Amino acid sequence: MLLSARYSRFCLVPWSDAISHPRELDAYARACFENLYGQPLDDWRIVLSPEPAGAARIATALPEALLQRLQALGRESRLSLRSVQPYLMAAYNRCSAQLEQGDFLFVLAEPRRSVLLLAAGGAWQQVLAQGCADSDQALQALIERTCELYGEHLPRVYLHAPGRGEVPQLAAVQLCQPASDADPLCAMWRAVA
């Protein structure tokens, strides 16, 4: 099952030489989320991207109550829920072979919400989830603002926008073609299936 960014929280977890145990890493990631969102995520499940020593990680938090409810619905329906993951990670993993190494901005444009992953020098620099109008102008402004905030020249931009009815007219590499029907959820499913 893929979850929209509406149900997920994302955070960059910087490398720390002081961490030597998985429990310490989990506590550190929770502290990073609390610092970013201003509240503890005690009832959220946190998963970190596997990165080499010295590199920042992307952390994803999913509400534990939502995960438990999905498990219960699966049992009630006699279905086996094998995987629950943020759509961002599924889309990035599916598209990663198309991305050139080095500096880039990966943009997942969901309906009314976009998530941006900024990489430089082969390491994650930022992850940002932002409400965004469903227009090319709003998306282009978000991309430019993100690059300005982090002092980066406009890197190569990869756009994954499967719910759009038309190909966005942006200076970006399109990672999937728009769906033939207007259901963005169905389009997202097809894009990462």
PLM regions and their residue ranges:
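Hydrophobic/aromatic-enriched cytosolic interaction surfaces used to assemble or bind macromolecules
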Residues: M1-A193
